[in-house]
Amino acid sequence: MAIPQASMGPSSLGQSGPGSMAPWCSVSSGPTRYVLGMQELFRGHSKTREFPAHSAKVHSVAWSCDGRRLASGSFDKTASVFLLEKDRLVKENNYRGHGDSVDQLCWHPSNPDLFVTASGDKTIRIWDVRTTKCIATVNTKGENINICWSPDGQTIAVGNKDDVVTFIDAKTHRSKAEEQFKFEVNEISWNNDNNMFFLTNGNGCINILSYPELKPVQSINAHPSNCICIKFDPMGKYFATGSADALVSLWDVDELVCVRCFSRLDWPVRTLSFSHDGKMLASASEDHFIDIAEVETGDKLWEVQCESPTFTVAWHPKRPLLAFACDDKDGKYDSSREAGTVKLFGLPNDS
């Protein structure tokens, strides 16, 4: 099926129309009051603490909608859930059952007790923190690497290594639809309005489908190389994509134009997260820092130092706390640092 191609994104300065750089893109004159205020806050809250979570590297972290819990998924085939208590994470439970690595997980958008995990064992599992049990195991056709829950809570989409995306009814746990794509599917996401479905792909494109019809709406040439991750801001104004070209591009949801780029990272952008107010964007890669930018200007607000590549970042849904996980070294390389920790930045320096 032919998909209308839009003009290039960050690479085509000066053009206008869907999928192009907006003409009002400009360099800001100096730090905004928001940036100065947040920098002041982080000067007193720049502490990062590590919390043991798994026996192998952590691939994914995510907060429940109420911010009370953080879940992590790991190469050790388990998920862990922590309770956030003041300035620390307290491990509540470890969730076993998958037969292979847990590559991605996400929470129900409005029920803080349910989360879902995607695994290479060709299943997804829905878990309930109240009973600490798996309430559903759904068999899928391939090794699952991407998962997201629709904003209305009714559907779970899961993508596998064969570029098949399956849409699963969150109540009946049955497959509602399945799409095989002819390109490498990376991250997947609904828009906040639940009426469009976005995929980032290996050709640097963002593919947009109508939902629930799953008919192609547009294909945006967003980056010259592999488009890896995508996130929507909680306010519904923007979405951001991260690419193998080390750029993060910010897009206007309604106009589908690229508003600005963030270019402080040197390595492929693996993971993104917007803060709860939509004003900060964290992005991370194999660089040994996480970039925190002000969304409206692209200005650097802060950087969080880390000793190894970062796999996953997630802002807390109510507070300026950033959870993340890195490629921790196993004991045989460096016995002082454990594999499988979850990290929390934004804690008071005196905590």
UniProtKB/Swiss-Prot annotation:
Q: Which Gene Ontology terms cover its molecular function?
A: RNA binding
Q: What is its main location?
A: nucleus
Assembly, in brief, is: Component of the THO subcomplex, which is composed of THOC1, THOC2, THOC3, THOC5, THOC6 and THOC7. The THO subcomplex interacts with DDX39B to form the THO-DDX39B complex which multimerizes into a 28-subunit tetrameric assembly. Component of the transcription/export (TREX) complex at least composed of ALYREF/THOC4, DDX39B, SARNP/CIP29, CHTOP and the THO subcomplex; in the complex interacts with THOC2. TREX seems to have a dynamic structure involving ATP-dependent remodeling.
Q: Which residues cross the membrane?
A: none
Q: WD repeats located where? A: 53-94, 97-137, 139-178, 180-221, 222-261, 264-303
Protein name listed in UniProt:
THO complex subunit 3
CC annotations in GO: chromosome, telomeric region; nuclear speck; THO complex part of transcription export complex
Q: What ranges does the record give for the region Disordered, renumbered to this chain?
A: 1-22
UniProt gene name: THOC3
Looking up InterPro entries in the UniProt record yields: G-protein_beta_WD-40_rep, Tex1/THOC3, WD40/YVTN_repeat-like_dom_sf, WD40_repeat_dom_sf, WD40_rpt
Q: Per the similarity annotation, which family is this?
A: Belongs to the THOC3 family.
Q: Record's SMART domains?
A: WD40
Q: Where in the cell is it found?
A: Nucleus; Nucleus speckle
Low complexity bias located where? 7-21
Keyword annotations of the record: Acetylation, mRNA processing, mRNA splicing, mRNA transport, Nucleus, Repeat, RNA-binding, Transport, WD repeat
